[in-house]
Amino acid sequence: MPERTMVRVDEKQLPRWTRWLDLGDRLLAVLLLAPAAILLSLIIVYPVARLVYTSFFSLSLTSGLPAEFIGFENYTAMFDDPIFWETTWNTVLITLITVPGALFMGLGLALLANLPFSMQWPMRLSLLIPWALPLSFAGLIFAWFFHYEYGVVNDVLNRLGFEGIIWFNSPNWAFAAICLTIIWKTSSFMALMILAGLQTIPRSLYEAADVDGAGKIRRFFEITLPLLKPSIVVALIFRTITALQTFDIPYMMTGGGPGTSTTTLAMYIHQNTVSFLDLGYGSALAVVMFALSMCVTAVYLRIIRTKD
């Protein structure tokens, strides 16, 4: 069979009508992408740009004064604001506790839901319940669960012979209750993401491992976990970003109390913009939270590229 050779042809040597056809294809691609690009700009780019712009102004609706350009004063004021540092630390701490907690709990639930048994669908259906519940509704439910007099948690403790805990009067216990609620609420998302990854692992790999005499633990660490890496990383990125923006559950359970011990950065932004109507400082806080989320995403992506 004769060998085929590839000949590179200069675009200038092609007929003019073929060059116009190629230009038409490019123009068509631009026209098809234009609506999505415009919509993305209206939904994301413009609000972020407007947020950054407003953060350089002193804009308080309660003062009745017009907006005044003050440069970076809103940002420098954060360094002298103890509540900013406390709420930022609370947000970081919630992220460090709830993201790994939801990951381990979600991994266990996904492995359980992936087991081959006859009643598999109720297990998988139950994973959707926490995920489908609105965050504010979950906060209200667990606020009742942890209620000192009528809560289910204290009722169980009393039946076991322990004294009930006044959960929301103590900063530490209130913080623990919020973290437990967030882990319960978000572990189902982790489980669904990991379960989707488990479904893509070829069964032949496990059969080959059985032939080689590999045990369950070895199969998990050498087959399951490495192949789940893409699903886990995507879930971690989404979950970390949402953890840094935690608002609904602590707002509904404690309102940020006692004091500001459970107030998150998102709640502090809401307080400044909605309660105090200080749009300038609130916008600066929101820019910091946005930058923090982008930094975390960049770190995750850098880790992925380094390991690959």
Swiss-Prot record:
Keywords: Cell inner membrane, Cell membrane, Membrane, Sugar transport, Transmembrane, Transmembrane helix, Transport. It comes from the Bacteria. Pfam families: BPD_transp_1. It is a multi-pass membrane protein. Its main location: membrane. GO terms for cellular component: plasma membrane. The chain crosses the membrane at residues 28-48, 92-112, 126-146, 164-184, 223-243, 279-299. One of its GO terms (biological process) is transmembrane transport. Residues 88-300 form the ABC transmembrane type-1 domain. It is found in: Cell inner membrane. Part of the ABC transporter complex SmoEFGH involved in sulfoquinovosyl glycerol (SQGro) uptake. Responsible for the translocation of the substrate across the membrane. The complex is probably composed of two ATP-binding proteins (SmoE), two transmembrane proteins (SmoG and SmoH) and a solute-binding protein (SmoF). Belongs to the binding-protein-dependent transport system permease family. PANTHER family: BLL4140 PROTEIN. This is Sulfoquinovosyl glycerol transport system permease protein SmoG. The gene is smoG.
